[in-house]
A protein has these predicted regions:
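N-terminal cationic leader/targeting segments used for protein routing and processing
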Residues: 4-7, 32, 95, 99, ...
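Short intrinsically disordered terminal tails
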Residues: 1-9, 77-83, 151-155
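Flexible coil/turn residues that form the inter-helical turn or adjacent wing/linker of helix-turn-helix
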Residues: 10, 85, 100
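Short conserved AdoMet
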Residues: 22-23, 97
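Acidic, low-complexity, intrinsically disordered interaction modules
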Residues: 26-83, 101-149
Length: 155
């Protein structure tokens, strides 16, 4: 598939993913559970990004969910994705989806405009217009994934 095709999905590094859920100063806003194959490691008390959690930065996130105050991610090893890069809305939401459906609400916000999507959110519907927007930060609140984006625009 051509790199300019808007529907192409790109891998998301764990380091870039976790940073979206941090306070911007190096502390993750959630406890973190990382599952890698048959191994699960946990980081409690809202870990610092520079601590042991950084050992997993270059792993690729294959799926994610939020459970209470835990950010739970499944990862796989990646030898080709060692550079940090921006995370697009579409790539982030694909990690949380179950066969293209999200069982929570989504709010996209660029501080000037807001786009809300109520449960169930189908990734192939209206929200797909915003898939190429670049994420700045995220947080989970009352069953809604709130995503701040650099600029809210439609593809």
């Amino acid at each position: 598939m051509d790199k300019d095709t808007k529907t192409e999905s790109y891998p998301v590094r764990l380091g870039d993913f976790i940073y979206l859920f941090s306070d911007g100063y190096g502390r993750v806003n959630y406890n973190v559970e990382i599952t890698y194959g048959d191994t699960t490691v946990t980081f409690e008390d809202f870990p610092e990004l520079s601590e042991e959690i950084s050992n997993y930065d270059n792993c690729i996130v294959t799926s994610a969910h939020v459970d209470d105050c835990w950010l739970c991610v499944h990862v796989e090893d990646s030898k080709y994705c060692s550079e940090s890069h921006s995370v697009r809305v579409g790539d982030l939401l694909n990690l949380f989806s179950n066969k293209g459906i999200l069982n929570f609400s989504v709010e996209l916000n660029d501080f000037d405009a807001i786009a809300d999507f109520e449960v169930p959110v189908e990734l192939s519907k209206y929200i797909s217009r915003y898939f190429d927007c670049v994420c700045r930060s995220c947080y989970w609140e009352d069953g809604c994934l709130c995503i701040f984006v650099k600029e809210l625009y439609e593809n």
